[in-house]
């Protein structure tokens, strides 16, 4: 994957496609951050994001900002991640590019939960769940339901947690080897049933 990101950057630079060159830089940065080279990854993500903004493009901007936020999470920069997610959510509202809205809200909820803001986190999980259901985006719905179920479990509301997550998990007929479904299944097993 890293080689492909390098190829995108090389071809885009050679052919004069700044949009694709910037996107390639951001994907390269995300891969580096995800694979432990966090400082270099964040630097590449910032460079790519600046280059992308310079093209005037806004499509996929929330996605790229979310990648930078995740890299900042890895580095322990929760406050920076929250600022980035707020920026991405503002772009979603302004442009109507809502396909990632549920995941952005869920991610923000996770970070607020880490800071001890339980009520705000729960509200964002509910918002993410509502958006995912409205869009019929089952993966985002699963992630939001799992996050909310974990919170409810931690609050001692195990039956509610199971009742929330079980039907969403039950919708899936394949992909059970994916990380999201494995984690949902493990949580359901812990809660007493799938």
Language-model regions, residue ranges each:
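Helix-coil-helix junctions within alpha-helical repeat/solenoid scaffolds
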Residues: 1-194
